[in-house]
């Protein structure tokens, strides 16, 4: 369900904060997007994926972060997104989270989410690549930042990690120098 509130009651925001329901909320140029908790399949895939990709990223000198961790437009207070995972150079770290140019953002699809609407924003803050995964089919799409726009690329080779992603027999297969994992 999509709802638009012209004015959000402070009590609602405080209740969401108190119950921990605001962790994945996003601020799109000052407009609050209240995001529900992801379904179980989404969370399970995200956890398994992070266990595989985080050590690879760390070995390449990248920070590994997962939801709820914010990606912020540098220098702007009310403009951030909360991807499922992101991998970024250490210099992108701030007290708020990651500022701008993450090397890779991972978005795991949920019903009625706004993954594809975020692509232009990710490009505008300098994200290098966005990996989109369907948790039901394990289908993967990779978008790369080309001159400030996210464009689909193939085959799915995550350049910043040196990882190939493909769907094999209903599983997400990740292959890298020295390893393979089926999720």
Predicted segment positions?
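C-terminal interaction segment
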Residues: 1-8, 14-18, 22, 33, ...
């Amino acid at each position: 369900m999509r709802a638009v509130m012209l004015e959000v009651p402070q009590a609602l925001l405080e209740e969401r904060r108190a119950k921990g329901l605001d962790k994945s909320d996003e601020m799109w140029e000052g407009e609050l997007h209240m995001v529900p908790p992801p379904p179980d399949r989404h969370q399970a895939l995200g956890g398994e994926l992070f266990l595989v990709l985080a050590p690879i990223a760390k070995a390449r000198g990248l920070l590994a972060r997962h939801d709820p961790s914010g990606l912020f437009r540098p220098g702007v207070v009310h403009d951030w997104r909360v991807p499922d995972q992101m991998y970024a150079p250490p210099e992108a770290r701030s007290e708020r989270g990651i500022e701008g140019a993450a090397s890779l953002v991972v978005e795991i699809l949920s019903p009625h989410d706004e993954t594809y609407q975020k692509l232009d924003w990710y490009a505008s803050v300098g994200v290098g690549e966005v990996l989109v995964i369907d948790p039901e089919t394990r289908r993967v799409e990779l978008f790369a930042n080309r001159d400030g726009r996210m464009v689909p690329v193939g085959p799915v080779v995550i350049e910043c990690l040196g990882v190939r992603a493909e769907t094999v027999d209903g599983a997400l297969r990740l292959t890298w120098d020295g390893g393979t994992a089926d999720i």
